[in-house]
Amino acid sequence: EPLAGEKANLQGDNQFVFDNNLPSIVIDELAWGSEAILTSTAAAAILIHNDGINILKRGITSKNNFKPGETCLRSIKDMKLISLANTKFYPGRDEFLYFCPNVPSILIVPINTKSFILIGGWSAKCFTKSDEKWINNWSKKINNMFLINNI
């Protein structure tokens, strides 16, 4: 298990914003899953991005419109979870300024080749392997819901 650092004073607003154009069954799943992650892990912020649109922002996030950069795009291209345990040492951390400007750790979890879950942690090295596995499995469920609902 990683040793989490001191909890950061994150910049941003506590938000819960989602795309109203999604079917209610999908909104319900995203609401449930994001709440579960925020309450059962060290996550402070969640964003779900699908095909150029941020379909969910929850937790301490920026009001600015997040656009994925090289790191997020690599995650969905390779279909691999990317863990940035300490963003202070990551040269590409500016990619996440419009997610949560001073977030100390990040998980990028691909859903499919055009969608991903972006999760920011309260402190450096705060996510466990168990957190990663649970969120990765949830991403598979989301992908199935997207397929069933033509999203």
What residue ranges belong to the model's regions?
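Signal-transmission linkers at sensory-effector interfaces
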Residues: 1-21
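Regulatory sensory and allosteric helical modules in signal-transduction proteins
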Residues: 53-107
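Short hydrophobic/glycine-rich mini-motifs in sensory/regulatory modules
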Residues: 109-119
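Cytosolic beta-strand hydrophobic patch enriched in CBS
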Residues: 47, 107-110
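Signal-transducing coiled-coil linker helices
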Residues: 20-33
